[in-house]
């Protein structure tokens, strides 16, 4: 369930669980911002959040699972609500929109958090070992599949290759933004690089 849904839809127990998750995450975020990923241990997180180890493991499997929770529970766009495009250009615009939404969420979390999240040591980013992929890729994959099934698009490459390429482009843009301490044109770079790639691979049937 998306953490941004109205709390009125949640039971008291679910709301309490959500509050505990947020408390744990805020503690992890403070540690990341002050000391970096190396200092982010479950012990330190629990001490900072003033919760037990058992409470942590009740909600998260690992510290990387904790970080992924807040990346994946961003404000979501239901792919079923994205209208089918009339052509490849409209499909491209919809995909770029999804990732501009992601850019906005990254800004909310801040450069310090994102810089420490996008590290090779965070194995939750490794698509080879993940059981679930981050939300934007899932949305885009499902959206493109609908376009292909409807006969609107005929991509030059397999869908899995395209979503993998998009993931790499997004990671590169996040890294550039973090490297420049937030001074890069995050939105502009994301729009331009994704747009050029999609121009090359999306074809109308």
Q: What positions do the PLM features span?
A:
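C-terminal peripheral helix-coil segments that are non-catalytic and often amphipathic
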Residues: 1-7, 96-97, 101-104, 138, ...
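Short amphipathic alpha-helical segment with a characteristic S/N-K-E followed by hydrophobic residues
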Residues: 24, 39, 62-67
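Short hydrophobic/aromatic patch on the recognition helix
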Residues: 49-60
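Basic, helix-initiating cap at the start of DNA-binding domains
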Residues: 1-35, 42-48
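Short secondary-structure transition hinges
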Residues: 104-141
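Hydrophobic alpha-helical connector segments
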Residues: 69, 82-108, 159, 163-166
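Short, basic, alpha-helical segments at the C-terminal edge of helix-turn-helix-like DNA-binding modules
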Residues: 71-78
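All-alpha amphipathic helical-bundle segments outside canonical DNA-binding/catalytic cores
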Residues: 128-133, 149-165, 188
């Amino acid at each position: 369930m998306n953490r941004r849904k109205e709390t009125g839809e949640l039971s008291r127990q679910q709301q309490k669980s959500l509050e505990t998750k947020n408390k744990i995450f805020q503690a992890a975020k403070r540690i990341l911002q002050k000391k970096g990923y190396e200092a982010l241990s479950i012990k330190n997180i629990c001490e900072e959040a003033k919760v037990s180890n058992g409470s942590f493991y009740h909600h998260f499997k690992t510290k990387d699972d904790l970080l992924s929770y807040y990346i994946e529970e961003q404000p979501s766009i239901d792919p079923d609500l994205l209208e089918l495009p009339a052509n490849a250009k409209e499909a491209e615009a919809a995909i770029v929109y999804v990732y501009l939404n992601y850019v906005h969420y990254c800004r909310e979390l801040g450069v310090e958090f994102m810089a420490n999240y996008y590290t090779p040591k965070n194995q939750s980013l490794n698509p080879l070992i993940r059981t679930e992929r981050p939300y934007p890729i899932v949305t885009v994959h499902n959206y493109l599949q609908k376009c292909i099934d409807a006969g609107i698009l005929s991509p030059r490459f397999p869908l899995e290759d395209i979503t993998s390429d998009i993931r790499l482009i997004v990671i590169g843009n996040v890294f550039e933004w973090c490297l420049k301490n937030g001074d890069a044109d995050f939105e502009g770079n994301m729009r331009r690089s994704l747009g050029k790639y999609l121009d090359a691979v999306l074809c109308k049937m």
